[in-house]
Amino acid sequence: MRTYHQLTDPDRSGLGDQIGAQRKRVAERLAAVRRIVAVMSGKGGVGKSYVTAHLARALARGGRSIGVLDADLNGPTIPGLLRDSDARRATQESSEPASGLDGVKYISMGQFLEEGSPLSFKGPTAESFVWRGAMEAAALREFLGDVEWGDLEVLLLDLPPGMQRYIELCDILGNPPTVLTVTIPTPESRDAVRRAMRAAVERGSELLGIVENMVGGELKGTAGDDLAAEFATAVVARIPSHPTPDTWNRLAAQL
């Protein structure tokens, strides 16, 4: 990955050529991936990564080849949810994803960071708001274009809150991915997720459905049904506070 000074030096960067080459590499790496699904919410605290990891495991238990890309670069949680006790730690030189629980392949910035260490890029602090986004987008391109994903039936993209990462991935992939939306029942979650779903639809993503998480507890509301009616899609799963493997198997059967 290039540094800030390499990106900003006009004689050395070749940024346009680099991005073009990476896009070509992404297309080549993902040529054997049958389906790409972005798991998103537009809101934090809804259990999106938890849903992504358990959905991936259920799909893998059903005999499918599954990969997960943890697109939450600043708050990666997928390694903690999928890491097998015997899994190796990723290295900068490796081009293979880690193999996690139930054989799910995954890649995450969390594999490269020391425990508790924040993500940081080298560059001038005073200008970080200008170049940090470009560096994060470059990291995503490398995760997709440099990792040997192999033959996958489904690649799940675990997105952070907000829409910036979704937009970056649309640009990197060339086509908008199918979207699976996660919400909790509350009106506040509904309103935040609505904005994310509307943006995804406007960008051209197919809506796979809505997962309503943390159902049946203290959280009250009808966010799942409200959003399903508004966007003419389905609530494909209602996840209770203590789901069983059958809960995830039923969700996986709908993909």
Regions flagged by a language model, labelled:
Residues M1-K43, A87:
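Extreme N-terminal, non-catalytic leader segments
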Residues M1-T3, A229-A232, R238-L255:
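NTP-binding/hydrolysis catalytic cores, primarily Walker-type P-loop NTPases
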Residues R29-A32, V51, L55, L73-N74, ...:
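Helical mechanochemical/support elements of P-loop NTPase systems and associated helical scaffolds
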Residues V33, G44, I78, I107, ...:
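Residue-level signature of catalytic and energy-coupling elements of molecular machines
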Residues R35-L73, M197:
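Walker A/P-loop phosphate-binding motif and the immediately C-terminal alpha-helix
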Residues S65-G67, A71-L119, D225:
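Phosphate-binding loop that captures ATP/GTP phosphates
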Residues G110-L169:
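Switch II (G3) loop of P-loop NTPases
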Residues D146-R238, T244:
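Conserved catalytic-core segment of NTP-binding enzymes
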